[in-house]
Structure formats: C-alpha cells, structure tokens
Amino acid sequence: MATSSLCSSFTSQTCNPHSRPHRKTLTLPGSVFLCRQFHLNSPSVSKTRRIRTRQSGPVASLGGLLGGIFKGTDTGEATRKQYAAIVNTINGLEPKISALSDSELRDMTFASRERAQKGESLDSLLPEAFAVVREASKRVLGLRPFDVQLIGGMVLHKGEIAEMRTGEGKTLVAILPAYLNALVGKGVHVVTVNDYLARRDCEWVGQVPRFLGMKVGLIQQNMTSEQKKENYLCDITYVTNSELGFDFLRDNLATSVEELVIRGFNYCVIDEVDSILIDEARTPLIISGPAEKSSDQYFKAAKIADAFERDIHYTVDEKQKSVLLSEQGYEDAEEILAVKDLYDPREQWASFVINAIKAKELFLRDVNYIIRGKEVLIVDEFTGRVMQGRRWSDGLHQAVEAKEGLPIQNETVTLASISYQNFFLQFPKLCGMTGTAATEITEFESIYKLKVTIVPTNKPMIRKDESDVVFRATTGKWRAVVVEISRMNKTGRPVLVGTTSVEQSDSLSQQLKEAGILHEVLNAKPENVEREAEIVAQSGRLGAVTIATNMAGRGTDIILGGNAEFMARLKLREIMMPRVVKLVAEGEFVSVKKPPPSKTWKVNEKLFPCQLSNQNTELAEKAVQLAVKTWGKRSLTELEAEERLSYSCEKGPAQDEVIAELRNAFLEISKEYKVFTEEERKKVVAAGGLHVVGTERHESRRIDNQLRGRSGRQGDLGSSRFFLSLEDNIFRIFGGDRIQGLMRAFRVEDLPIESQMLTKALDEAQKKVENYFFDIRKQLFEYDEVLNSQRDRVYTERRRALQSVNLQSLLIEYAELTIDDILEANIGSDAPKESWDLDKLIAKIQQYCYLLTDLTPDLLLNECSDYEGLRSYLRLRGKEAYLQKRDIVEQQAPGLMKEAERFLILSNIDRLWKEHLQALKFVQQAVGLRGYAQRDPLIEYKLEGYNLFLEMMAQIRRNVIYSIYQFKPVLLKQDQDKMENQKSGKRNARPPTDTNPDPVGTVEPSTSASS
C-alpha cells in the first residue's frame, strides 16, 4: 500500500565565489509587489559562499542554497579515461560491422548467443555486441549511440549505477547491456517507473533487439496471466517496478503451475533507479485481501475528528505523521461514543478515531490524494501521478473516504508483502541509471552494494542555476514567482514551473490567469493526465508556460522550439484513431480502469507550428484509408491502435505495407514541421533557452535536480531558480526553533531574506530531512531483512508443493515431524519408561489420526524399549497411516488425493502466513517501546519473530497432516455412476476446500488440536 508524505526537500548549490555580484529588479504592474525590489547574488552572500563548507557534498549558501548540484562535481572524465580503450575497440569494429547486410547483422546475434551459452564470458563478447547494437540502432532508429552512451552501457553491464544527465539518451543506453546479457538465454528485465514509459521504450528502442532477432516483451497492468507469461519469457522484457513486484507476490499466491508468470531472475536494468530504490523504498509492496469491518465506525469517527480541535483534543506531529489524543480528547471521545475505554479490544474505537484525525490533519485533498468519481486516489508525491489501484493500509484509506463522505470500501488484510530493497536484491546482477544518483552514493553502496559512476556528457552542460530566493511568508513567494514568470514570458523564453501538489498548481494557475499569462497545467487531475506527453513535449516552445506537479519519471524530453516528431505523431493520431478504434456498444462491459473511447482525439490547432500542406494531408489520408481497409473500420481497441501508431511513428524499414505507408506519412509531416520548429528553436536559444522555476523544496534533492535537469539538455542554453518560503513544509517541519525565530524576526513578507544565520538553519534543515528519511528506509530494510529470510523459506516450501509431481515424500516428512511434536509435548525425552503417560499420548495421536485405533499402552511398551525406540515406532505408524489414507482415497476417487494434498498445503501456508504477517506487524509496534527499557527493538523483533516463525511452520505441518488424516471423500450419485470413467483416468471430482463441504471431497475443520 502506498503512503504519502507532506514533507519536501531541498538541494545545495555550488556557485563561483569570485563571480561579480549583479542586481536584478523584478516588478509586476498592478501587483502589491509593485516597485518592491530584491537583490540577488549580493556581496554578503558571496562572502558566505567562501566560508561555508560541507563534508558531504557541494558548498551550500543562501545565494545558491540547494541550487545547481552539478557545478563543481565529478564531470565523468575519469570514467571516460577508464573505458577509452574498449570504446576505441568498438569504434575500430564499426567499418566491418557497417558493411554487413541486415541478415548478416542478425546472424551475429545467433553466433554470439551460441558462444555465450557455450561458456564464453560476456566481457569478451562486449565490444562486438555493442558494435552490432550501435549499427542496428543507426539502421532502425536513425540514431548512432555516442561514445559516452557506450560508456554508460559498459557501466550498466558491470552492475553499477550510471549517472547520466537528462537528455543524454539513457533509454538507448539500456539496450546495449540488455542485448549483451540476453545472449545467455536467461532473460533481462528493463524496469521503468510507469506503464507509459515501459510501452514507449519497448515500442521505440525495443525495435533494435527485435531487428537483431531477439524477442522483446512488454508487461502492462491490464494483461492476462497468459499474456504476461509469454512476455516474461522474451529475451528482454519491459515492465514497471510495481507490476514486476506484484507479479512476484502473485506468483507466490498461485494455486496452480499454470498461474505462474515470471521466469527466474537474471539481470535487471532499472531506469530512474533513485526514484525506485530510494524514494519508493519507504513503502513496501503489499497484496491485500478484504477484511470485515463496519463502515459505521468510520463515519462516527470522522464526525468526532471534525468536531475536535487541534491542540485541545489532540496534538499533531507532522514530522512523524502521527497524532496523539489529549486527556480531554480521550474523555470527550468516550463520552460521545458511550464507551468506557477507547481501547476496549471488543470494539477498538481508538484506531478509528486516530485514523480519522490523521485523515483530517495529515492527508489533504489535492495534495496527498484526489477524488475521481466516488474514489479516493492516492497521488504519488515523487512523480505527481495517480497511483491507480493503490490504497493506504490499516484503515487509513477508509478514514479518508469517510472524511470525504464517500462509500467505504472494506478494510484489507495483508496476504503478501516485500520491500523494494529485498525484492531487487534477488537479482544476481542489478544495475540502474538516473540523472541524479550522486547525492545518494552512501545509501546505494551500503544497502544495495551498488557503485555509482558518473558518465560524462556528450556536450558540456551550460545551464545557469540562479541563486535561490527565500521569503518569510508564502504570499511573498508566490507573488515573486508570478513576477519571474511574467518577466521571462515577455522575452519569449519558455518557462517550466515545478510545484509539489495539485493544490499548488491550481492556485498558481489561477494567479497566472489573473495576470493574463497563457499557460498549461500538468498534474494528477484526469483532464490533465490525458495530455501529459503533449504538454511536456511542447514546453520548450516560444513563450510557453507550463506548470507541472513534480517532473520525476515524466520521460518526455523538452526540446527547444517544440518537438516536431511528436507533433507529427499527434497529427497522424488525430486522423487515424477515430476511424480504427471501435466504439463500446451499449450494455457491453467496460473496464473501470479503461473507460470507453468517448474522446475525439482532436488536438488544439495552436499546438501545431503550421497548417499542414495539402500534399502531406493527402499522404496521411491515403495511409489511414489503407489502414482502415486492411484492419477494418473501428475494429481495434484503443490500446491496439496506439501500439500500431507507435510502430508507424518510428524510423527504419517496415515490412508491413500499412505500417510502411503510415511511417512515410509520419516522416514527411515531421520534415514539414521541423522547418518551423528549427526557426522557433533559434528564437528560443536567442532568448536564453528554457527557464525552470521551482516553488518549493522536496524531501528529495534528486527531484529538485530532475526539475532543473529539464533545462540545458544536450548542451542547450537554459537557467533555473528556486523560490522558497520559511513557511514551506520542509522548513516548518524540520527547521526547528531557529527557523521559527527567524520567522518572528523578519516581519516583511515581500522582501527576500539574506542572512548567514538563515543559511546555516536551512542547511541544517536539509541535513535533518535527508537523515530522517534515510533512517526510515534503513529501518524498513533492517526489519524486512528479518521477514525476508522467513519469506524465502515459506515461498520455497510453497513453490515445492506447487511444482512437485508427487508430494508423498513431503507429506511423510510432515507426518513424522508432527508425531515428533506430539511425543515431545506429552513425554519428556529424559523421562524414565515407567513414568510415560501413554494413555494421554495415544489419545492425542488418535485425535490426529483415527486410523491408528490399534494403538494401546501395552503395544507401545512391548514394541519400544526406550524413548528413541518409541519415536521411531510412532514415526513408522504415522507414515503407514498416511499411505493407508492415500490408498483409500485413490480407490474411491483416482487422482483426487494429489489435488487434495496440494490444495491443503497451499491453503494452510497462505492462511497461516497471512496471520503471521499480522502478528509480526503487532510485534514491530510493541518492541518499539522496549527501547525505554534499554533493550534493542530490532533484536527483540528478531527473537520474537523467529519464535513465531518456528511455531507457524510447525502449525502448517500439523494442520496439513491432520486434514489429510481426517479427509473423507464424499461421492455424489452421478460420480458413483461414473466410477468406471474415473478409474480410466477421467475425473469428475473437485479438490476439497477447507471451509465448506465439497460435492466430492470434504476436509474436516483443520483447526488441529494443540499438542
């Protein structure tokens, strides 16, 4: 389940201490801010820069606080030298590889695959493989990977993290090591942060390995198990981090081999690795099942929370995201609910009231979630996207639904869970790439054992990161932001404004409307999400103003002057989609996740740089008519049509006649648009390039750097500036008393603050937020490590039961160990023979297995001379009883026993593992208090968790063998009539269930008597 945080973070900037200070005056006619001046890069700030140092990274100061992280850091030249020899070898192979025909190039794959599978090392195959991929990319995509991209590929092949700047072609880089590592035949996973990027990368750069004879697969959320299995078996599979993790958990809940979809783990390339392994690592992946809860309690608690007042009835700790009822709060709640104790275990009102107050104070609409229809949808704080299908756990989501007056969905109980840390550590070889990893080198190396390597840029980065501007109050900050946007807009420079919430983006949008500034908004709201790629791709056009809620993982480059190819695709899409996408018939089932295509696909004409010529309009019409004739009028689903359009809008040869015609039209339209976008690009560059405005610091500096990195791609001109307020969440929550003192000292809202004390206070706040969230991730990892070893054991046992053809040996082992448990519980190993209570022992054994009716004290005394003899004899009888029961069932219903055994093992593992997870959650909450008794909570958790685990594994064995011993097939009359068919191998019996009697086989209640 996803959780959300109200905290933001910020970044330090390294500036030239010798730069000449300059003064800028920002004014907006008609504003309260009229004629107010604020001075940037003042001499006092420059002095501060000279004296402030940080051990952990770049110099921090007010005049560049949290600014350009890239200045003064490793430029990757050492990496360039390290790999220079191999790059030269690859370049030396280029003439030879270029001379090969397409089929000869494809044959290189088969030859390399054969060599790899015979044991030749991938390192020795690397130069040739990279040269082949480079040539294929040139032929298929029209892109020749630069030398620095080859270096990036080699870094990934070594199992390291490659830090590559935005716009350096990370998507293409991933193909190089993916192709090389796929040669061994064990599969490669390329992991992205969302479905859109997975599909885009598979359809675009996936053409390269496909052209070279490899199978490339794509996993999407709405696929069937069969489709997923087929795609996971491909040489290279594109998939999102969450879908891969959930498929792993679902595989470990499967009840038949046919339901398994994932092949074994081999090599994994993670795009935006910091977002996945750092930002999302605080929240484990959880698959939940429904649990019965009364919705009335949520609504009553919501009314109480609404009536209660902060600091009177309760206090709020925004840093810990917790609330605490005061004495008056307890008394008033108990009086309203007419209960004696909020913590009465029969009703447990306390959790409902606490969650209701959390929903009121800490989980805010259009910040942490949005409302769509009658659903509360979580907004990912790192990407600004809606997290479809994700819910907060422990009743919190229901509390938010009650607050909003929406229908309450059932509370959930955890069926399976895993942290991203432990999930990805299952890969024998793991690597990743991002534009912002340097800030988290320590965490990558300590938890994941991944080295971070800086890859040099192809062209020098010349973006100018301006000084940060800090105000006392948010009102002054937002006025200054509007002034900045207006000033840039007048020069024609495109502006990208980053906000941290939907609420902020809507508020700023309203202010820009009042100022008469045309703009686009990109946030989690449905009407904006649909146009995401369109909005981002055109953010670099002359005079464009774009407000975006977080830019992590957006995946679309902002090209100065506009993206001609993207516009050409939109034009072709506008013409084609209405004619080939089928309409949903009335009454036909429509997926909630995929609404019917009621839209027209019509694009605002202002988006296109020019009116399309008649010649290209006719070319597009002709291609679309051929598509309609070949595919059928309105015969495709929207997803199918989008996939075919994607294939059409690529470069390189196409075998299919329709795709070839559409591709030709796309290329011609692109050429026409490029004439205009190139002219516009020159104007944008002359104006200064893309200007990025940050409005608040996130808790992760990397997200701020990703926002900055949208400007200055591939050596483009650009600039960035952040506007901050002491009322921003990061300073308010983590700033401490010093920030509060500064807020009282500086009374003027509209003037920026310059103070060495402030610089130090903000620097400390930054360290606090980074350390705080690192500690959370580290603690989650440490606690999940305990669970991970248990999870591995349980999943191994479960997979053994699922995939074994014959479970006889496993069941005999269960029978013998259960007999051992009963014996040890009733007769001590050191007890003399004369003191054995055999009547009690026999009663307990016969309670488990009614077949052992012949056991008597005299028989045991005669057969067994000592304790070990007794153990061996009872083990033998337990085994014989199991084999006897197996024969009885097989005679009545051939083949049923195998199904019953598998079903009973899987169902008991799943049920008891679910209960174990709940128990561990309570243990983790309880051990936290033991720190006050000078006891390490983690060690306490390990000890108690281990004891609970041993008891759970024993209980699984006992329940299963008890159910097997008690199992009595009940045949229906038609089954008796068809006994002959059953004996010949045709079975009409269904597997038993552990709850309700089955028409064919029933299992007695498996609440086995405790030994």
Swiss-Prot record:
InterPro entries: Helicase_ATP-bd (IPR014001), P-loop_NTPase (IPR027417), SecA (IPR000185), SecA_CS (IPR020937), SecA_DEAD (IPR011115), SecA_motor_DEAD (IPR014018), SecA_preprotein_X-link_dom (IPR011130), SecA_SF2_C (IPR044722). It is an enzyme of class 7 (translocase). It is found in: Plastid, Chloroplast stroma; Plastid, Chloroplast thylakoid membrane. GO terms for cellular component: chloroplast stroma; chloroplast thylakoid membrane. GO terms for molecular function: ATP binding; chloroplast protein-transporting ATPase activity; protein transmembrane transporter activity. Residues 1-22, 976-1011 are annotated as: Disordered. It is a peripheral membrane protein. Keywords: ATP-binding, Chloroplast, Membrane, Nucleotide-binding, Plastid, Protein transport, Thylakoid, Transit peptide, Translocase, Translocation, Transport. Residues 1-17 have a biased composition (Polar residues). GO terms for biological process: intracellular protein transport; protein import; protein targeting; protein transmembrane transport. ATP binds at residues 164-171. Residues 1-59 form a transit peptide. It catalyses: ATP + H2O + chloroplast-proteinSide 1 = ADP + phosphate + chloroplast-proteinSide 2. Its EC number is 7.4.2.4. Has a central role in coupling the hydrolysis of ATP to the transfer of proteins across the thylakoid membrane. Facilitates the transport of precursor proteins from the chloroplast stroma to thylakoid lumen. Belongs to the SecA family. PANTHER family: CHLOROPLAST PROTEIN-TRANSPORTING ATPASE, SECA INNER MEMBRANE COMPONENT OF SEC PROTEIN SECRETION SYSTEM. This is Protein translocase subunit SecA, chloroplastic. It comes from Pisum sativum.
